[in-house]
């Protein structure tokens, strides 16, 4: 079948599929119209583009094969839209089935698999890179850092992007091995580069890849610049903008490599080995400046901390053990069993069957189960000696920690001897420890956290005289809010409550019914002195310390770390606390019970993804997500009428959080406005116990969060209180899923 024969068949097949799906209720009218307007025209454009033959000779034959096989749903999902350009760049599926991903791993970027404008492939990466390169040249930008993690063909995607930037005259700094995202975000300001890119999809399952884009200070681009990049460059980019300069043709002084002290054995430096910069050492030395225990190395000689580590097939496999070792820890037990310490983007230790795809997420209890069982296989009879077991995700920007449970509390965890600490408890403990060790000048300090992160952080900060800034979800918001405080704009946000400015304020009038684009609420920030960020954190296992005002907008904060999350840094911080606890004859688990809960009360946070694994697939999955949101908005109306309860708890108030940031994807209509930051139902007047439904804007999934609180004066038997609130959390999720018609049919290790 040639192109002329395929196009009319494709047009007819696409329309028939969309009409039938609409009539059957599998897609809604808005999605139908968008797909009808876009799919065939995008397909025709690709098939008639001669540049694609040059860049990816197997692309068109694979598309024609899909048309001949009448794979209309796959064709629609490949071409119904452009890959969505969001806060951090682009992210999406490379293909819709495992066989195609395996084929790409074996055959390379030009593997004969179905590609389109809505999949992550070499054409999309090259076109996006050309758009970003043109944006940068118009702004006078000259230097860029590029890296990649363990994702399938990550190196090839990164090298292709680098060749585009070399053609456009940039000086390129290219990592010579899979690297953690935070090493990229550190390298950018360290090298005075202008931008950075990491090929990664963070903790998403094996089907995904992406393009994380950072600005000169290592944070994500702010919303205004991001919109300029998309509206003025990405949207109008064509394959004609794609030009390549191979590494071996790069001009002198234009191509440098980032790595360790010596060249990697199996890496081709194109004859430029002399241009290797030891970035690993610089990043490590920077992190070590945050150590508060001066004699840690000597301490480890006499009372060594027993640390387990699991890379989950990711780029932390070398970086994290190296950092811990250099800091002075002697007993690091890396999990090598089942290939978990090898960079493998297929993530073979995680479920990959269609519809059940698991994420290599260190904050997921099932990932912790994989790590624990693999550790026991790898190091027989050693698990009982472990103090902590650390895990990081594929790009090592998230960190999870497994700890042993006291015997008398194991019934809380179905008899298990271990548990995965929630990020909420973990970050509260990190903050508590560092406040104890650095208690001076509290009036100058503040913390930043997302609105889905536990109020245990807010409480313990306030009780120690520290200000609090809550933002919407995403480290880009944490960094942007911190920059607002650095710039002295705290007065603009002291009147923001539940994300909304006062209606009669200037910003309130401008925003109307929309929430502030960044800030959720501030506490204790009105003294005019707070300028030093001592912690920035998220419920989703991300952490950093942003420091004080930077000397310029291209630098890290004064005394601060990277402006995005860093799992390697978090591992370093947690290990120090665990070592200190061991010196005191206690554990992380006991510290939380004995130092945190008695001070702030018991906060029990719950989290579930919907669906439990992956996302609702394709255009039909988009309809399912919207249907669940419509039901949630219906529950909001019931709550406002005073008629709603969950698991026997009456809802006292409710809010919808909407900034409008995804209105380009989900245009508002008379009957539906996308609640991008979610809906929240409160069970108490103090708003400390609540349930939140939050959708993904760029994927077909949702997040459910709960927070239940018991005042310290009401705790009594702490273990009993834990049991009661954990039990109620499970009941809340069950009732919520029943009401939303989103059953938890695959939740494992509850």
Regions found by a protein language model. Name each.
Residues 149-150, 156, 170-182, 215-236, ...:
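Phosphate-binding chemistry for phosphorylated carbohydrates and sugar-nucleotides
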Residues 583-750:
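Catalytic-core signal marking the mid-to-C-terminal active-site face
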